[in-house]
């Protein structure tokens, strides 16, 4: 009996019937940076063995289904804008004055040459709807193991999502291919208070199959429930707005 108790204390606990709790945790993580609506200023730093580049962006969100991100610098990329409405996504390139709709097959493609995908940027994939969830917990963290449902088209065979319990904050996501090989990691860093909410102020995306590559998004400012964000902020007309 004593030996059994020691084993239970030393190893994480797989919580039976915990899918609803896992869904609630994932939903809370996905709402961290959004709220009902939000405005955000971000810097994205892309590093490769050959070069490094930095982009500054302004973004707005409305609920889970609306998002727009506009590059404000450097000058050569200024005005490039990405719009997401429901499951549709468009990019606007002001230099050629052209709107290009992103097909579903390209959602896992790189956004602006970074290690983040189009899907990462606009969060089109709904984890709680498209993945089966298994919750493992210990005294300090939740580990949620996500595997795609039978009818889900996914680049990932599995996602391990590690979340700190107190305060409830994301720590890391590990992405595996269909063969069980870990191919990238998303690490959350440097928690700060924005609009009264504590959340990570930086996210590092590390592609493990591309040595020397790293993309970091820094959140410079976040405002929740800002005035002026409405349905019309996410129109195709707004997408083509020049700055």
Q: Locations of the language-model features?
A:
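Sec-dependent N-terminal signal peptides
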Residues: 4-15
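Flexible, processing/modification-adjacent segments and terminal tails
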Residues: 18-37, 43, 53, 86-157, ...
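Extended lipid/amphipathic-ligand handling interfaces
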Residues: 29, 57-61, 188-193
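Short hydrophobic/aromatic-rich beta-strand segments that constitute the beta-sheet cores
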Residues: 40, 67-71, 89-93, 99-101, ...
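N-terminal, post-signal-peptide region of Sec/Tat-exported proteins
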Residues: 40-76, 168
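Solvent-exposed coil/turn segments that connect beta secondary-structure elements
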Residues: 45, 62-64, 72-74, 87-88, ...
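Generic beta-strand structural signal
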Residues: 61-62, 83-85, 92, 135-138, ...
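Gly/Pro-enriched, hydrophobic low-complexity segments
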Residues: 122, 141-234
């Amino acid at each position: 009996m004593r030996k059994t108790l020691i084993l239970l204390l030393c190893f994480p606990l797989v919580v039976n019937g915990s899918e609803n709790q896992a869904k609630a945790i994932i939903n809370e993580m996905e709402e961290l940076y959004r709220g009902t609506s939000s405005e955000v200023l971000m810097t994205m730093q892309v590093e490769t063995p050959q070069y490094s580049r930095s982009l500054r962006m302004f973004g707005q969100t409305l609920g889970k289904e609306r998002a727009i991100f506009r590059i404000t610098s450097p000058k050569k990329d200024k005005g490039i804008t990405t719009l997401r409405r429901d499951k549709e996504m468009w990019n606007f390139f002001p230099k050629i004055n052209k709107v290009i709709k992103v097909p579903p097959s390209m959602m896992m493609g790189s956004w602006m040459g970074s290690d983040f995908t189009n899907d990462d940027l606009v969060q089109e994939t709904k984890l709680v709807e498209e993945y089966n969830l298994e919750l493992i917990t210990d005294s300090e963290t939740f580990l949620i193991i996500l595997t795609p449902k039978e009818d889900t088209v996914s680049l990932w065979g599995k996602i391990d999502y590690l979340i700190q319990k107190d305060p409830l904050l994301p720590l890391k996501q590990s992405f595996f291919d269909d063969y069980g090989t870990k191919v990238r990691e998303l690490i959350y860093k440097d928690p700060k208070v924005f609009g009264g909410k504590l959340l990570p102020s930086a996210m590092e995306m590390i592609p493990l199959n591309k040595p020397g590559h790293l993309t970091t998004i820094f959140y410079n400012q976040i405002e929740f429930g800002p005035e002026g964000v409405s349905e019309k902020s996410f129109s195709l007309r707004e997408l083509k707005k020049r700055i």
